[in-house]
């Protein structure tokens, strides 16, 4: 039971705002493109898929962040008790958790069309490199915006896999939204 609690601490399940910040752009993309005259079943199913995907990928992202920041986290009062920084969970076990979470997310991803699957796979390096941006740029919030709002594009293409300027415009608007909330948070 202690190990399970440590896992829940590791994925920050008690702080679900990160999940919602990843999920909301997905729901916006789905809502923008969905043809509600055909009913709601696909829309609701895709909302569920994107919510589960956001939960799994945010969880994996938290673990990767903690692995990459473990030497810094131990020095900061707010983060020194995180499971990896404190030594309660090993890096190797944490990596196993990341593989499991990403595998489960992939099982959800393959429920979509080929373009959406491809977009999801392309997003992986960006999702896991955000913690490094805090070290190498003065604008990590901008990188976070590009990464966290990518689901809007994926959701649009999951319904209509052809190019349109509409999701791009909303995507850039969402990036500015992220710049705002993450600047306030930081």
Residue map of PLM features:
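Multi-pass alpha-helical membrane architecture of UbiA-family
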Residues: 1-186
